[in-house]
Amino acid sequence: MINKKIITTKNISKVIKDKYILKDISFDISEGECVALIGPNGAGKTTLMNCLLGAKFITSGDIKVNDLKPTDRTLKNYVNVLSQENAVPERLKVSELITFVQKIYEDHLNNQEIDNILRFDDKQKDTLASKLSGGQRRLLSFALTLIGKPKIIFLDEPTAGMDTSTRIRFWEIVNKLKNNGLTIIYSSHYIEEVEHTADRILVLHKGELIRDTTPHAMRAEEVEKFFTLPLQYLEVLKDNENVYNLEVKHDSFNFLTKKPEEIWTLLQAAGCTLKDLEIQNRTLLDSVFATTKEN
């Protein structure tokens, strides 16, 4: 059975001060899919999420969420978002905050369902939400996002500030939500969170959608070679057509190539030996996350 398209975008662009923040992006997301948005800082991930949520307007193109414009008020309880910032009140205890949010929704998670997500003890529930650790606040914010039983959730860098054990717990919850048919769109700086959780990957770079693929397909793509060399060999390669993403550092430079044999022939002719260079394999997925970490 083919699932219904729950989000559709057609040629959407967003321009600010004559600069494209998003440029001519089109994709669909089906009901129940788990989709990862990846790309370097400044690629447009958060802006795209905000446009899908109706929090920011697009300059051109069209977005539909459940066949409605993202600003339609009937989507209020249908969609929710975990933003990058943990916005928790200063003076409410965890238990008080949960009760407050439950009262917003006619149909909401009960206390036992929330306990199953948080696994907080009585002392933690009696603590001011603002006094929790960063990872606990993040998990609490996530639970608050789910209280109204949304059908679509957006998670913007969801595990930021979490320790390893909390992060593992978080993705256990996400996988259960996937199995229950929730549609999930998230961004991440962790490669393992994309490989093990996402059904699809949307790769953004400088506001453009450069790839719509799956973790398996992306891993199977052609492998590039990542070279690191001393600066003395820069003149040999700096204008070579098979060298790209060249970056010069204090005492070395690095680059990517799909023609390592040709590059090695040139380097040998210039007196380079194996001890002078370092070579690593990189798929596109590796390259995206390496760029993200550097930024």
Can you say where each PLM-predicted feature lies in the sequence?
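Conserved ABC ATPase signature
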Residues: L128-L132
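Catalytic Walker B motif of ABC-type/P-loop ATPase nucleotide-binding domains
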Residues: I153-E157
